[in-house]
Amino acid sequence: MKLKFTKMHGAGNDFVVLDGYTQPVNLTPAQVRALADRHFGVGADQLLLVEKPTVAGVDFRYRIFNCDGGEVEHCGNGARCFVKFVRERGLTDQRSVRVQVQKGTITLTMQENGEVLVDMGTPVFDPERVPFATKGLEGRREGADTLWPLDVSGTTRWISVVSMGNPHAVQVVGDVEAFPVLAEGPVIERHARFPQRVNAGFMQIVGRNEIRLRVYERGAGETLACGTGACAAVAAGIRRGLLDSPVRVHTHGGDLTISWDSTREGEPLLMAGPAVTVFEGEIELPD
């Protein structure tokens, strides 16, 4: 089958975006993997699918598939590319759209400066809802947050557990470039205490309003940037009393700005950052 696609990226986190709004797109996990393959396909961290919503009061449905073929709940950098895509394709002329994701809805706004502002929703810190198994563990309070000990290859790492619609484990490190992210990331991702696996975040505090971040993503490995990972890290840092909003997040792919008023109940995190169209094309996929 032949399939038209658009290649996009948000701070280096790259995507294959498909229009399933004006035409049916039903891909198998094997076809998703073929599209995302960097040697034999287009190459991407995730595949993004635009569809008609299945609930009332929203404009589009936003689905995300990791390069391993599995569908996931959320992708913040992809959300910025999503709104740029639907506007460029003429599917909407609105600057702000409401989008259905796997666990609720989010609002995406194209700003005058070309960056996209994403309402990322409210972070969840309840371990059961992340989910994270705490049986037999004793947490440690730091500020308004609870840190949990995690055995990583025989070393105890103290982590914050956060859900941004998808699960995150965030730890503070001294030097994010020197830290063994590629060694510890996959161990944390598949740790038995995370029944749905987890995105592993490694955060270096630069100042009260600035961090450096690397994320080993569930099902994708380390990516150049992770929007939900940036939000989870900032939320954890603010709760721990280490950061003040807004926070500039430096990733290998570029910078994101995260804002959050943690003093207001149910207040969402806001993420601002770039969305770039790289090229469009057509590919022959195996049936």
UniProtKB/Swiss-Prot annotation:
Keywords per UniProt: Amino-acid biosynthesis, Cytoplasm, Isomerase, Lysine biosynthesis
Source superkingdom: Bacteria
Subcellular localization(s) per the UniProt record: Cytoplasm
Pathway, per record: Amino-acid biosynthesis; L-lysine biosynthesis via DAP pathway; DL-2,6-diaminopimelate from LL-2,6-diaminopimelate: step 1/1
Record-annotated disulphide pairs: none
GO BP terms: lysine biosynthetic process via diaminopimelate
GO molecular function annotation: diaminopimelate epimerase activity
Catalysed reaction equations from the record: (2S,6S)-2,6-diaminopimelate = meso-2,6-diaminopimelate
Signal sequence segment: none
Residues reported to bind substrate: N13, Q46, N66, G76, N77, N166, N199, E217, R218, G227, T228
NCBIfam families per UniProt: DapF
Assembly with partners or alone: Homodimer.
Name by which UniProt lists this protein: Diaminopimelate epimerase
Species of origin: Paraburkholderia xenovorans (strain LB400)
Gene for this chain: dapF
